[in-house]
């Protein structure tokens, strides 16, 4: 938390002759702490320098020598107290604390883990709960297409008809063969990691070989990716407006049986998402994830929920949706 302090200095009055008394009012504003998840205090205060007097006019008297004398004026106690009393505070809610409190009400069964990140698009406020890394499963398909679009932009070209066919099947229907084709096209993990470096993802690492579903990521990184997809040029998106519009459109046309997840907190059909689900053969447990943009209560939110260790896919979906609802309450129930 940063702070700024008003600095006051005093200047000694030269001896040997008298000078008219100067009156000044000093106003300082001290801002103590300012962050999206901290508390901002704005303090307005009037100060008087050492030996200052009230603003009432002095009563000078002329001597035979022409010198000017100044009567001393005693400040009242109330004036002195007023110096430190004028204060106003504007509080910015700690969303991380609210999210942690809301998530405490979510039942996480057995060996399951869950992490969630939310951004209020309008205000720019965000919150993250949980810092662990998770398998992406099929949510990485958004990242794969974003990387492909970025590479196409760099080459000054549009996607080919074949690439568009793969992209549509990969996002709308979560087709794995299409994902493998585009994963190979972008250069696998190396290509994905290079794109993610430009996107600002710092905790995501592409899966080995053709195992794109085992890419590791964090909820915070998925929120960063969503800001690339649903952001603007002014918010620093590396994707062009045309690329963003294309990807958003696909995420808004998800197959009927795959519309669960973060859509649980949306108003009607006001969502664009991608879900991921993957049974791990070593444990028999499920990775279940959901990322996307939702509109709730007239506000747009970006939401990412990651989970693993779920006994079944259905239980994972229930956990993800409960976490999304809890996360939304940290922004809407205040």
Report the location of each language-model feature.
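Amphipathic coiled-coil signal-relay and dimerization helices
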Residues: 124-131, 271-272
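Active-site SXXK
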Residues: 124, 133-157, 170, 303
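Glycine/small-residue-rich loop that forms an oxyanion/phosphate-binding "nest" at active or ligand-binding sites
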Residues: 148, 173, 180, 184
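Penicillin-recognizing serine hydrolase domain
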Residues: 2-7, 13-68, 75, 90-114, ...
